Amino acid sequence: MVEVEEKYMARCIELAKGGRGNVSPNPMVGAVVVHKGRIIGEGFHRKCGEAHAEVNAIASVKDESLLKDSTIYVSLEPCSHYGKTPPCAELIIRKGIPRVVVGCLDPFPEVSGRGVRMLREAGVEVVTGVMEEEARALNKAFMTLQTKGRPYIILKWAQSEDGVID
């Protein structure tokens, strides 16, 4: 089972990269809807202020009746608050998707476990931490800003053997 979940989460992470450079200050997120071992929908967060990955993945499903017997895989915990878009956790509940697999929790204070809690309170089975390290690494800058309150910094240093910086 873990191998199967990792296969779909790897696809979520790959999809999420499609948002690179367009979603800041939000994180890159990918989502895949799976019905009986087959991907029936997928999406990613394309641009800041527009539909999130879960919304795009669900919208891409041709037969909505399959959602009630499907699993949605998401690289980051579904949001649970109203911002520029409505909460993805509410959409998942409304569509009747019974199972959600999450790569990593969202450290953003307005989400931070609330999305998972909202889903579980509605009777949705939620699995967290699938490929968590990879899911967190995808959004190093976002994670650093949310958890440490500072930008993610990369430093390159070049100096000669005698210690002179060039």
Describe each PLM feature range:
Residues 70-71, 99:
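Structural motif
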